[in-house]
């Protein structure tokens, strides 16, 4: 692998991680900055549209969640000059707001296309493939015990 391709993979991994951070912290300006202006996001039957439309949609969709943890597992990148493709296995945890909190866990894959323009990698196309999902009530007693003495995360930029 060439040094340029390796640097491309590092930049792409950072891009995917920044996207997850933006979703987790509800930093939708950060999420939007991960996409080229002409990019398309296809969220598996729930949404397909432009980057601006996606950011508006996901911001609204996450209002009902008190916690969102997007995680990326195995990742593969194929870099070809200023274009690349990526496949990422994802594990996404969502917890709805009280009073009847639910835990939604989604396993899937992101199938991405990227372009490097003006030296910057961004999504040109992002598609999610749904592999598995579960939704269960939150175990409130267990939740209270497990997090009793630990700092609690936040869906804002003030997260510890």
Language-model segments: what does each one mean?
Residues 92-96, 114-116:
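Beta-strand elements of well-folded, non-transmembrane domains
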Residues 103-105:
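Outer-membrane beta-barrel transmembrane domain signature
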Residues 1-37:
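Short, low-complexity N-terminal intrinsically disordered segments enriched in polar/charged residues
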Residues 9-13, 56, 82, 94, ...:
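Binding-site signature for planar aromatic cofactors or substrates
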Residues 62-64, 98-101:
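Short, P/G- and charge-enriched loop/turn segments at secondary-structure junctions
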Residues 28-92:
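A solvent-exposed, acidic/Ser-Thr-rich amphipathic alpha-helical stretch
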Residues 85, 107-140:
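Short beta-strand edge/turn micro-motifs at domain boundaries
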Residues 134-160:
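Acidic/histidine-enriched, glycine/proline-rich intrinsically disordered or flexible terminal extensions
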């Amino acid at each position: 692998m060439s040094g340029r391709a390796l640097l491309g993979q590092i930049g792409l991994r950072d891009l995917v991680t920044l996207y997850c951070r933006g979703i987790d912290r509800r930093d939708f300006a950060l999420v939007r900055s991960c996409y080229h202006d002409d990019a398309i996001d296809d969220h598996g039957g729930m949404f397909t549209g432009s980057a601006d439309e996606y950011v508006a949609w996901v911001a609204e969709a996450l209002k009902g969640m008190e916690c969102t943890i997007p995680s990326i597992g195995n990742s593969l990148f194929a870099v070809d000059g200023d274009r690349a493709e990526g496949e990422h296995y994802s594990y996404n945890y969502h917890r709805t707001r009280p009073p009847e909190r639910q835990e939604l866990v989604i396993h899937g894959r992101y199938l991405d296309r990227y372009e490097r323009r003006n030296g910057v990698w961004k999504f040109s196309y992002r598609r999610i493939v749904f592999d598995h999902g579960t939704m269960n009530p939150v175990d409130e007693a267990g939740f209270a015990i497990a997090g009793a003495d630990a700092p609690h995360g936040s869906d804002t930029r003030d997260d510890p």
